[in-house]
C-alpha cells in the first residue's frame, strides 16, 4: 500500500467514531502484513504533515521491528537506522521525538553501540550542541537509550557524568534538567567506586534542578525525584557528603503547604528512604532535630475547614481500613517517624522526641493531641523494648486518657495507638488488662448504631489487646461475648458483622478452652455466613473462614468432628468465588485443619495443592504501567496472523518491554501469595508422608518467589522452604526410604545455600531475621544432614559471623559512616539475636568436637557484648547464646572454661534478672559439661549460688539457680551431694516460671536414686511435699514424676519409719493420695 493510503487508514483511527475505528483496525491488520507496509510506515514517520500520524507511524514501526528486525536485509537495516536518526534531528514536536527515541532504543537493544556508531556520534554531537532544542533532543534520546540497556553505557560513565554535570546546571531549560535526571536515575544502580568523585559533583546540581522543576511541573518533578532515590540506594556512597543539603531541600518541600500533596508526599517518601539507608549519618551530622521539627507540624496539620482527615470520616460507602490510609502528607510524615523509630537507637531518638510529644499532648488543639498519639503509636514499633523497660506505665496512661478525650479525632488516634501498643509491647502490656479492658468495653458499648467506622477502630484496638491476654481474658469473657453475639444477632450492617466475626477470632485465641460454652452459638452464626449467597455479605463470609481457622487452632479437639465439613466448605467456596482474600483465608483454614487432621487431610491434598499452585504462579493483579507516550496500544496483537509462521522460525525475537515503565501490584494478590506460602509450609509438616507426591511441584513454585519484589512474600517463601525441609525429614523418620532421603538431601542442597545468600545479600532486615529463624529450625530438625556437603559448617559459621560483625547487606553503612557507636536500633539488636539463636543449633547439629574450632571464633564477638557499657538486651543475648552453645558443645566446652567462667560469674551479679538468669543457667551447663577444668571451680560456684538462692526474689532466676545447683550436685567428683545444698535446693521447689528445668530436676532425682539413695532420708519430708504438689500438674514432665516416685518407693520400703514420719507432715488428703499412688494404702 502507498503511504498516502496508509495515512488515510491511520486518520480513520483518530476519529471519534467506533464503527469506523473498528473497520479501519481490521483493514490495517491486513495491510501491515504486506512487505510494503514497513517502507510506507517509515515514509510517514519521516514526512507526514500531521504530527499525530508521524507519532502513530513511529509506534507501529517500533512494534513491527521489535520481533522482525533480524529478518530484514543488512542494507534495509542500515537505511532504517539512518532514516530514523535523520527524522529525529528534524522533528519539532515533542511527542513524536519521544516515539522516535523509543524506536531508536528498540533498534539499539538489538544492535548495541558497536554496530551503530552513528547513534553514538549523534548523541555526542547533539548533547553538546549550542542550540537548546537540539541539546534537549539529544538528552531525550540519551535518557531513552540508556534506560533500554544501561549496562552498555558503563564504559562511558565518566563522559556521561561530565555531561550531566553541565546539563544539570542549565536551570533555564527544564526539559534538559528532566532528561538529565532521567538518565541519572538509570545510571545510578550501575555506578562503580571509580565513578563516585564525578557522581558526587552532581548532587548539589540535582537539588538545584529539582528546585527549578517543582514550580514548573510538579508531576514531572515527582518522576525526576527517582534519581535521588536511586542515588540513596546506590551501593557506592554518593550522597553522604551532601546529606545535610539533601535533607534541607527535602524538608523545605515537605513543609511548603503552597505545593500540591503529590510532590510533598513524594518528598516524604524520599525522606523515609533516606532515614532507612542513612540513619547513622543523620545522627553523626546532627540532622535529627531539624527533621523532627519539620515533621511534627506536618503530622499535626489541621484539614481544610469543614473537612476531616480521611481516617476520621464515618462513611460506609467508602470504607477505610483502620490502618492509616489517607493519601495526605500527614500520613507519610508519620511513616518517616516510624522509620526513625525502626532505624535509630531509642536512646538517641526518644530524648529529642518526648518533649515535642508532651507539648502536643498538652495542647488545646485536638489535631496536636492526635499528632502526639499517632507518633506514640508508631514509636512502639521500632522502640518497643525501650518503651517496655522504661516508659510503658506513663505512656499507656496517656493513651487511656485519649480514649476519653472530648474530641472524636483524638479518641480515634488513641484507639489506633492502643492497637499498636498491643501489637508491639507484648507481653508487658497484657498485665494492664484491669485498667484497659473496662475502658475498651465501655467504648465499644458507646459507639452509636450505624457508626461502623468508629466501631472498626474500637474493634481494632480490642482485638489486638484481647488476642494476647490468655487466661486474663476470663473475667471479661461473658461481657465480650455478649457484645459480639449481639452484633451478629441484631440487624446491623455487613461491615459491623464482619468486625464482630473478626473479634471472635481474637477472643478465641485468648480464651482457648474457656470458649467452649459459646462454641455452638458461634458456629451457628459462622455457618449462616459461610453458606450465604448474598454478595453484600461476601466480606463477612471471607472473615468467617478466617475465624473458623482461628477456632480450629484455639479449641482443638471439639473442632475435629467438624473438620471434614469445614474442608469441603472451603474447597466449595474456592470453586464458586474468585477472590484473592477468600482463597487466602481458605488456605489458612486448611493449614489449621491440618493440625487437627494430620494425614487425614490426604484425600483433599490434590485439590488443595492444585489451588495453591495456581495462587503461587498467578500473575493476576500485576498490572504493567505503560510509559505516558504509548497511547497506541490498539495493535498489541497486530502480528497474530503471523503467529504460526513465527513459531516455525527459530529466530523469533523477544518482546521488547520498553513501553512498560514498571508494574503496579494489587496488595491483595501479594497477600494471597504470602499466606499461600505460610499455609502450604504448615500443611507439609502436619501431613508429612501424605504430602510427598505434591512436594516437588510446590517446592519449585515457592522457590521462584525468593525473587519476588514484595518483602513479605520473600519472607514467607523462605519460611515455607524451611518447613518443607522439616516435613521431608519427618517423612524420612516415619517412612525411611532411599527416595525420601534423596528428596531431603536435594531440598537441603538448595535451601541452605539460598539462606546463606539471603543473609549476605538481602537488604530488608525482616527478611533476614525470618531466614535466620528458618535456618535455626532446619538445623534443629535435620541436624547433621544440614551440614553434609564438605565445607558447609564453615560457610554457615562465616555467614553468622558476618551478622555479628554487622557486615551483611541489610546492616550495610557507608565507609565514611563507620565508627564505633554502642547504641543501635532495636531491629539491629533483634537481627543479632536471631543469629545468636542459630549458633547453639549449629553446635548441636555439628557436634562439640567439630564445632569447637568455630566457637573459638564466635567467643570474642559474644564476650565483647557483655562488657560494662553494653545494653541489657546485648548482655542478655550474648550470655544466653553462650549458655545455649555450651550445651551444644557438650564435653568439648571443657577447653573454654577459663574464658567462659569469668564472663558468667560477672554477669550473674547484674541488676537485670534476665541477664542473671541466663548467666546462672550458663554456669550450670558449664559445670555439667566442663569436666575437670570446671570441677576445679565448683567451690567458687557453690559459694555464689548457695547464698544467692536464699535472697533471690525473681522466680525465673530462682528456678535457674535450682537447675544450676542440680547440675553441680550431679557433676560433683565425689558423686555425693552436699546435704546442706540438697536441702536448700529441694526447699526452693517447685519451680515457678522456667518449667523446662523440671527435666534437670528429674535427672537429679534419678541420680539420687542410683548413686546415694540412703542420703535422701533426711530430706524425705521435702520430697513428699514436692510430690504432693506436682503429682496432678500436667505441665511437669512424666519422666520427672516417675523418677521422684521411684525415689519415694525406695524410701517407703527401705526406711519405712522415716517415710511414715515424713508422711505425717502432709495434710491427710495429700498423704492418702500419695500412699495410693505408691501402692501403700
From Swiss-Prot:
Pfam families: HEAT_EZ, IBN_N. InterPro entries: ARM-like, ARM-type_fold, HEAT_type_2, Importin-beta_N, Importin_beta, TOG. It is found in: Cytoplasm; Nucleus. GO terms for cellular component: chromatin; cytoplasm; membrane; nucleus; protein-containing complex. GO terms for biological process: protein import into nucleus; protein localization to nucleus. Its main location: cytoplasm. It comes from the Eukaryota. Keywords: Acetylation, Cytoplasm, Nucleus, Protein transport, Repeat, Transport. HEAT repeats lie at residues 348-385, 390-427, 431-471, 475-513, 895-932, 936-974. The modification N-acetylmethionine is found at residue 1. Disulfide bonds: none annotated. Residues 24-90 form the Importin N-terminal domain. One of its GO terms (molecular function) is nuclear import signal receptor activity. PANTHER family: IMPORTIN BETA. Found in a cytosolic complex with ASF1 (ASF1A or ASF1B) and histones H3 and H4. Nuclear transport receptor that mediates nuclear import of proteins, such as histones, RPS3A, TNP2 and VDR. Serves as receptor for nuclear localization signals (NLS) in cargo substrates. Is thought to mediate docking of the importin/substrate complex to the nuclear pore complex (NPC) through binding to nucleoporin and the complex is subsequently translocated through the pore by an energy requiring, Ran-dependent mechanism. Belongs to the importin beta family. This is Importin-4.
Amino acid at each position: 500500500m502507498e503511504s498516502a493510503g496508509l495515512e488515510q487508514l491511520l486518520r480513520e483511527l483518530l476519529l471519534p467514531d467506533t464503527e469506523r475505528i473498528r473497520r479501519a483496525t481490521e483493514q490495517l491488520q491486513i495491510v501491515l502484513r504486506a512487505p510494503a507496509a514497513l517502507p510506507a510506515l517509515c515514509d510517514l514517520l519521516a514526512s507526514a504533515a500531521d504530527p499525530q500520524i508521524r507519532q502513530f507511524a513511529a509506534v507501529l514501526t517500533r512494534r513491527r521491528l521489535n520481533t522482525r528486525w533480524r529478518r530484514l536485509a543488512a542494507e534495509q537495516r542500515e537505511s532504517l537506522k539512518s532514516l530514523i536518526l535523520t527524522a529525529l534531528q528534524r522533528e519539532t514536536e515533542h511527542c513524536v521525538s519521544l516515539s522516535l527515541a523509543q524506536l531508536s532504543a528498540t533498534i539499539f537493544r538489538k544492535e548495541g553501540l558497536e554496530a551503530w556508531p552513528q547513534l553514538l556520534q549523534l548523541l555526542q554531537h547533539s548533547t553538546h550542541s549550542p542550540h537548546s532544542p537540539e541539546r534537549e533532543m539529544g538528552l531525550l534520546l540519551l535518557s531513552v537509550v540508556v534506560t533500554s540497556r544501561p549496562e552498555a553505557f558503563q564504559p562511558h560513565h565518566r563522559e556521561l557524568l561530565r555531561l550531566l554535570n553541565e546539563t544539570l546546571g542549565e536551570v533555564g531549560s527544564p526539559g534538559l534538567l528532566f532528561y538529565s535526571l532521567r538518565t541519572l536515575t538509570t545510571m545510578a544502580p550501575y555506578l562503580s567506586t571509580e565513578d563516585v568523585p564525578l557522581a558526587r559533583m552532581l548532587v548539589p546540581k540535582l537539588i538545584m534542578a529539582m528546585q527549578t522543576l517543582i514550580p514548573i511541573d510538579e508531576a514531572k518533578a515527582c518522576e525526576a525525584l527517582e534519581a535521588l532515590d536511586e542515588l540513596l540506594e546506590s551501593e557506592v556512597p554518593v550522597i553522604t557528603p551532601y546529606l545535610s543539603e539533601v535533607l534541607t531541600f527535602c524538608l523545605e518541600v515537605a513543609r511548603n503547604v503552597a505545593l500540591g500533596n503529590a510532590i510533598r508526599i513524594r518528598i516524604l517518601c524520599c525522606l523515609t528512604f533516606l532515614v532507612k539507608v542513612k540513619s547513622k549519618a543523620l545522627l553523626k551530622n546532627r540532622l535529627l532535630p531539624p527533621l523532627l521539627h519539620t515533621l511534627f507540624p506536618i503530622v499535626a496539620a489541621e484539614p481544610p475547614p469543614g473537612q476531616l482527615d480521611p481516617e476520621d470520616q464515618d462513611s460506609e460507602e467508602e470504607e477505610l481500613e483502620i490502618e492509616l490510609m489517607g493519601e495526605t502528607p500527614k500520613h507519610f510524615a508519620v511513616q518517616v517517624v516510624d522509620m526513625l523509630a525502626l532505624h535509630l537507637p531509642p536512646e538517641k531518638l526518644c530524648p529529642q522526641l518526648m518533649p515535642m510529644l508532651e507539648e502536643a499532648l498538652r495542647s488545646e488543639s485536638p489535631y496536636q493531641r492526635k499528632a502526639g498519639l499517632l507518633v506514640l503509636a508508631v514509636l512502639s514499633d521500632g522502640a518497643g523494648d525501650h518503651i517496655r523497660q522504661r516508659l510503658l506505665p506513663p505512656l499507656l496512661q496517656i493513651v487511656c486518657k485519649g480514649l476519653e478525650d472530648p474530641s472524636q479525632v483524638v479518641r480515634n488516634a488513641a484507639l489506633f495507638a492502643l492497637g499498636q501498643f498491643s501489637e508491639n509491647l507484648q507481653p508487658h502490656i497484657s498485665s494492664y488488662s484491669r485498667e484497659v479492658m473496662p475502658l475498651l468495653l465501655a467504648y465499644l458499648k458507646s459507639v452509636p448504631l450505624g457508626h461502623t467506622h468508629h466501631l472498626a477502630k474500637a474493634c481494632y484496638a480490642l482485638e489486638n489487646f484481647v488476642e494476647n491476654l490468655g487466661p486474663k481474658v476470663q473475667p471479661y469473657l461473658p461481657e465480650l461475648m455478649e457484645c459480639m453475639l449481639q452484633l451478629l444477632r441484631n440487624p446491623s450492617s455487613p461491615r459491623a458483622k464482619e468486625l464482630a466475626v473478626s473479634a471472635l477470632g481474637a477472643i478465641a485465641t485468648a480464651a482457648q478452652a474457656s470458649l467452649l460454652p459459646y462454641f455452638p452459638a458461634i458456629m451457628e452464626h459462622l455457618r449462616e455466613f459461610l453458606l450465604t449467597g448474598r454478595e453484600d455479605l461476601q466480606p463477612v463470609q471471607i472473615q468467617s473462614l478466617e475465624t473458623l481457622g482461628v477456632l480450629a487452632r484455639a479449641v482443638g479437639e471439639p473442632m475435629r468432628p467438624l473438620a471434614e465439613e469445614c474442608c469441603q466448605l472451603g474447597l466449595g467456596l474456592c470453586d464458586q468465588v474468585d477472590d484473592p482474600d477468600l482463597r487466602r483465608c481458605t488456605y489458612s483454614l486448611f493449614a489449621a485443619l491440618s493440625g487437627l487432621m494430620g494425614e487425614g487431610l490426604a484425600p483433599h491434598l490434590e485439590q488443595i495443592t492444585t489451588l495453591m499452585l495456581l495462587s503461587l504462579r498467578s500473575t493476576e493483579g500485576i498490572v504493567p504501567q505503560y510509559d505516558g507516550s504509548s497511547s497506541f496500544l490498539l495493535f498489541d496483537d497486530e502480528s497474530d496472523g503471523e503467529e504460526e509462521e513465527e513459531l516455525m522460525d527459530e529466530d523469533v525475537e523477544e518482546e521488547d518491554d520498553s513501553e512498560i515503565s514498571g508494574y503496579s501490584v494489587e496488595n491483595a494478590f501479594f497477600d494471597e501469595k504470602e499466606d499461600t506460602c505460610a499455609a502450604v509450609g504448615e500443611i507439609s509438616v502436619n501431613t508429612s508422608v501424605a504430602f510427598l507426591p505434591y512436594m516437588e511441584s510446590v517446592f519449585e513454585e515457592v522457590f521462584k518467589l525468593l525473587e519476588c519484589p514484595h518483602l513479605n512474600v520473600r519472607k514467607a517463601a523462605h519460611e515455607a522452604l524451611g518447613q518443607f525441609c522439616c516435613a521431608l525429614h519427618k517423612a524420612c523418620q516415619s517412612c525411611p526410604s532411599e527416595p525420601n532421603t534423596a528428596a531431603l538431601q536435594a531440598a537441603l542442597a538448595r535451601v541452605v545455600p539460598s539462606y546463606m545468600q539471603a543473609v549476605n545479600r538481602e537488604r530488608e532486615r525482616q527478611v533476614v531475621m525470618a531466614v535466620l529463624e528458618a535456618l535455626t529450625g532446619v538445623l534443629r530438625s535435620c541436624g547433621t544432614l544440614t551440614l553434609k556437603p564438605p565445607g558447609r559448617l564453615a560457610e554457615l559459621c562465616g555467614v553468622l559471623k558476618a551478622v555479628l560483625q554487622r557486615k551483611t547487606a541489610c546492616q550495610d553503612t557507608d565507609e565514611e559512616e563507620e565508627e564505633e557507636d554502642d547504641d543501635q536500633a532495636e531491629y539491629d539488636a533483634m537481627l543479632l539475636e536471631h543469629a545468636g539463636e542459630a549458633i547453639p543449633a549449629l553446635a548441636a547439629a555439628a557436634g562439640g568436637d567439630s564445632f569447637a574450632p568455630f566457637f573459638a571464633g564466635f567467643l570474642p564477638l559474644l564476650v565483647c557484648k557483655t562488657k560494662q557499657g553494653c545494653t541489657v538486651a546485648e548482655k542478655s543475648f550474648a550470655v544466653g547464646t553462650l549458655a545455649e552453645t555450651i550445651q551444644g558443645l557438650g564435653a568439648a566446652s571443657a577447653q573454654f572454661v577459663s574464658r567462659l567462667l569469668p564472663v558468667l560469674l560477672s554477669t550473674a551479679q547484674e541488676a537485670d534478672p534476665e541477664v542473671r538468669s541466663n548467666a546462672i543457667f550458663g554456669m550450670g551447663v558449664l559445670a555439667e559439661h566442663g569436666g575437670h577444668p570446671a570441677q576445679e571451680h565448683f567451690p567458687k560456684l557453690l559459694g555464689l549460688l548457695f547464698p544467692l538462692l536464699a535472697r533471690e526474689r525473681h522466680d525465673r532466676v530462682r528456678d535457674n539457680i535450682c537447675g544450676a545447683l542440680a547440675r553441680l550436685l550431679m557433676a560433683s567428683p565425689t558423686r555425693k551431694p552436699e546435704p546442706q545444698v540438697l536441702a536448700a535446693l529441694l526447699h526452693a521447689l517447685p519451680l515457678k516460671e522456667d518449667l523446662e528445668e523440671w527435666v534437670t530436676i528429674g535427672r537429679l532425682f534419678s541420680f539420687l536414686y542410683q548413686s546415694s539413695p540412703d542420703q535422701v532420708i533426711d530430706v524425705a519430708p521435702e520430697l513428699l511435699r514436692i510430690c504432693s504438689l506436682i503429682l496432678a500438674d500436667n505441665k511437669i514432665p512424666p519422666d520427672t514424676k516417675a523418677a521422684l516416685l521411684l525415689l519415694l518407693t525406695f524410701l517407703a520400703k527401705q526406711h519405712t519409719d522415716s517415710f511414715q514420719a515424713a508422711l505425717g507432715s502432709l495434710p491427710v488428703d495429700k498423704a492418702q493420695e500419695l500412699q495410693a499412688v505408691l501402692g501403700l494404702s
